[in-house]
């Protein structure tokens, strides 16, 4: 039986720190240095704290989920378009569909239910737990366990998750690490990172209303991940 593959990747943004309630601000700021002792260090670490809000599903949210079928070279990006309501569009076999966070998470888990193999870059430790928490916040139950059995590559029955960040570092055994950009560079794959858009620029792009640009960047991520998987599949995957 042919296994149905799904490459996936997400984009997130953090909350606006200044708009948070005071109790939450104080809780987040507990570890900051004494402002009266070192104002410069305090301000520096406060800015870093604000920058890192995106990395927690408690202080951030999903604004794009990209999915891609590497066998058919087709995919979709479900993305948050703010208050605008753009028409669905398709560019180079990638559909772009505007949705709110709850809708895109519901769509992802519906797709997950009918796929067998999942491919990501750093998805087991980052994307999947993030989506699971955000899903629970919206009252959505995941349909697959994509975090368990890391070393065996086995998750829930009939589901396999290939996290390339883990696999290419031999599950942490190797002394080196690499970003998706560096792995793509090494294998001659077009990198999704550009001067205009990269992971650390998504937050500002979202504030600026560049929703489709973020979605297109996410599409480049899933395509690059699919190409990187092809290298791993051909040259690293154990032959059974």
Spans of model-derived segments:
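Alpha-helix capping and helix-coil boundary motifs
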Residues: 29-48, 93-96, 100, 142, ...
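Metal-dependent phosphoesterase core characteristic of DEDDh/y 3'-5' exonuclease domains
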Residues: 2-4, 60-63, 67-94, 98, ...
